[in-house]
Design a protein with these regions (language model features):
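Short glycine-/polar-rich loops that comprise or flank the Walker A/P-loop
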Residues: 7-9, 37-38, 67-72, 98-100, ...
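Short glycine-rich substrate-engagement loop in P-loop NTPases that contacts/grips substrate
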Residues: 21-22, 68-99
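Walker A/P-loop
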Residues: 29-75, 91-93
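Conserved AAA+ ATPase core "coupling" helix
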Residues: 87, 157-186
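Conserved nucleotide-binding/hydrolysis micro-motifs of P-loop NTPases
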Residues: 46-48, 78-82, 108-111, 148, ...
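Conserved catalytic/switch belt of AAA+ P-loop NTPases
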Residues: 29, 92, 112-145
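Pre-Walker A (pre-P-loop) alpha-helix and adjacent loop at the N terminus of AAA/AAA+ ATPase modules
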Residues: 3-43
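Conserved AAA+/SF3 P-loop NTPase catalytic/coupling segment centered on the Walker-B
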Residues: 82-86, 96-125, 155-164
Length: 186
């Protein structure tokens, strides 16, 4: 009789990526205790499963005091044109005053004004909260309610201070054996 490890339960059907899955398991366990995760930056070449890994991670974040998955929002950053659009079309309707895990895929495409705003939003402090003002609105960010995950193939295009505010998780390129296993699963 085969036993299933905790990592296999948390990341079913994800082949390889042992180190990344181990780190993410640690953060899932920490989230269970504190309702917070560090801001994460998944970095890997195309086709290494950044989005799939982030989605699997997100499915394992449970709202504290409830037995349901924390809501998830994923956007492709190529759709973000400027800070005003980001605030009006993403922050206001989807993130403000919400319990949510927010994944920004292809984050190297985030415009500079949005990256600069994220520097303020993600600035670490003991209260685990920040306020970002834009126009007439104040966005009060509580990291016990909102979790940020970024994914990129081109980390060198990200502002260094923004990278410094994130826990970097590098995914490995798949071996031929792992690619064969992935094909068999699909």
């Amino acid at each position: 009789m085969a036993t299933t490890t905790l990592i296999e339960k948390l990341f079913p059907n994800i082949v390889g990526q042992t180190a990344a899955k181990g780190k993410m398991r640690f953060y899932i366990e920490g989230h269970s205790a504190s309702n917070m995760i560090p801001h994460m930056m998944l970095v890997a070449p195309k086709g290494c499963g950044k989005t799939t890994m982030a989605e699997a991670f997100g499915r394992n974040l449970v709202q504290k005091g409830e037995a349901k998955q924390k809501p998830w929002l994923s956007i492709n950053c190529s759709s973000i044109k400027n800070l005003e659009q980001f605030f009006d079309q993403i922050v206001m309707p989807h993130l403000m005053d919400k319990d949510i895990t927010f994944m920004m895929d292809e984050c190297h495409m985030i415009p500079n004004d949005v990256q600069n705003a994220l520097l303020t939003v993600l600035n670490p402090n003991p209260s685990h909260t920040n306020t970002f003002s834009f126009g007439e609105f104040d966005w009060n960010v509580d990291f016990k309610r909102i979790s940020f995950i970024f994914a990129t193939t081109e980390s060198q295009k990200m502002a260094s201070p923004l990278m410094d505010r994130c826990e970097r998780i590098d995914l490995e390129e798949y071996s031929n054996e792992e690619l064969t296993e992935i094909v068999k699963l699909n």
